[in-house]
């Protein structure tokens, strides 16, 4: 990534994190913030490890995603420290020597064995707020055991504040968009060439330069009726005899930050399914333009149901009004997931339900159990906007069982079933004014 502004943006970002850490420690009554990067995990009855996943609290401070057995230590008023695990190992590639825009801001201690960190961690352990997984525990009595205690007051505050992205974070998320769009373009080309789902996936990974261990989530590459499976990840090795549609939900990572993008393509650009895709795309753009400060995300979700049902009404697939389809649950059969979620260090980022930085929960509206965001939007938040329309046999059968078969024109629905469904997703930044769509400009630049 070649962004000359990044060092200055990172310095500002680090200043914000220090201020947040000061408050989190004050609220939780601890003297030191200690964040392990995480450990390798091993498969049961085997000597093979699972892919390493860094602690999100660690990569919030440091652009390091492949550094197990390391630690961040922050004490208010002092220079932060990084305990950097770089073993002597001829079996595996070891982490590079510390380098990059972050190095000048930390005291760095190289260790060769995980237990070497004990001599460098603040003492006593009881004075430390340790944020991590249980497997990161280090030490033994009587000298002290550094067991992640995850004090709730600190977690509540830090996760809530993560909703407000710094300019540094936005810069990395923009780059994650650019990388993902490169893959989306390659995937669409492979689809147009008649490739299988697996071959499309490989084209995507090759264009992005990331594999399953790097991508922020497993790619969804769905041809035809497979698009009716919301998280379809099977990836058929052979192409279908006749391609009708292609749904791709795939992102990319940039120094620990994620993008999450979905597009749907029709094999026949002059067909009725293409017209339906175009209608959902237009509605999705409108939904994205509503990501404004002070708007309740729950209301955006309900409004999305009404807009999508209006499309189905226009296409003759439902016989009732959008309002009636929503009230009777018919809309949930066609749009069974939430409008979106927060995104950042994690694809489904934290604090989507948080009532405040002191805890509490804002519940989902009744009848919408899969919504992942219930907060009022504020500047600095980044959310996905991902409406969808699907033809899922199981859910459509429930419409019939619930006595609402007359609300649906089944012949019209049957005509679209071979296409599976449609989902279109962008990542959108809430600002003090107009929202900034982070995804669409990346597609325009890659055209």
Where would I find each of the regions flagged by the language model?
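Active-site neighborhoods and metal-handling regions in enzymes and metal-associated proteins
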Residues: 1-447
């Amino acid at each position: 990534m070649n962004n000359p502004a990044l060092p200055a943006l990172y310095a500002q970002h680090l200043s914000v994190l220090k201020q947040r850490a000061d408050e989190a420690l004050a609220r939780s009554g601890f003297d030191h913030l200690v964040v392990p990067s995480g450990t390798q995990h091993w498969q049961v009855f085997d000597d093979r490890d699972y892919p390493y996943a860094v602690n999100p609290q660690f990569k919030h401070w440091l652009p390091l995603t492949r550094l197990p057995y390391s630690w961040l230590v922050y004490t208010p008023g002092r220079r932060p420290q990084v305990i950097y695990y770089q073993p002597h190992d001829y079996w595996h590639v070891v982490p590079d020597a510390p380098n990059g825009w972050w190095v000048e801001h930390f005291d760095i201690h190289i260790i060769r064995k995980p237990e070497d960190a004990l001599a460098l961690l603040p003492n006593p352990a009881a004075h430390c707020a340790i944020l991590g997984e249980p497997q990161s525990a280090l030490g033994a009595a009587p000298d002290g055991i550094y067991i992640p205690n995850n004090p709730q007051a600190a977690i509540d505050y830090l996760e809530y504040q993560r909703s407000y992205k710094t300019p540094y974070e936005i810069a990395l998320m923009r780059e994650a968009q650019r990388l993902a769009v490169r893959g989306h373009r390659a995937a669409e080309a492979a689809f147009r060439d008649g490739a299988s789902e697996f071959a499309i996936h490989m084209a995507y990974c090759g264009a992005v330069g990331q594999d399953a261990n790097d991508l922020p989530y497993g790619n969804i590459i769905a041809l035809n009726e497979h698009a009716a499976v919301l998280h379809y990840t099977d990836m058929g090795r052979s192409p279908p005899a006749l391609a009708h549609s292609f749904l791709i939900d795939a992102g990319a990572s940039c120094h620990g930050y994620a993008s999450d993008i979905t597009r749907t393509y029709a094999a026949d650009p002059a067909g009725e399914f293409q017209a339906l895709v175009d209608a959902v795309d237009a509605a999705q753009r409108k939904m994205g333009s509503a990501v404004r400060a002070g708007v309740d995300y729950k209301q955006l979700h309900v409004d999305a149901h009404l807009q999508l049902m209006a499309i189905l009404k226009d296409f003759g697939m439902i016989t009732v009004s959008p309002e009636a389809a929503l009230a009777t649950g018919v809309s949930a059969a066609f749009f069974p997931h939430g409008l979106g979620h927060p995104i950042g260090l994690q694809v489904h980022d934290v604090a989507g339900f948080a009532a405040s930085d002191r805890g509490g929960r804002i519940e989902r509206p009744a009848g919408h159990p899969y919504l992942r965001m219930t907060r009022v939007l504020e500047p600095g938040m980044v959310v996905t906007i991902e409406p969808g329309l699907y033809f899922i046999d199981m859910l459509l059968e429930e419409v019939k069982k619930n006595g609402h078969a007359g609300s649906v024109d089944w012949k019209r629905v049957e005509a679209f079933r071979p296409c599976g469904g449609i989902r279109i997703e962008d990542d959108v930044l809430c600002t003090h004014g107009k929202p900034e769509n982070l995804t669409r400009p990346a597609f325009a630049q890659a055209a």
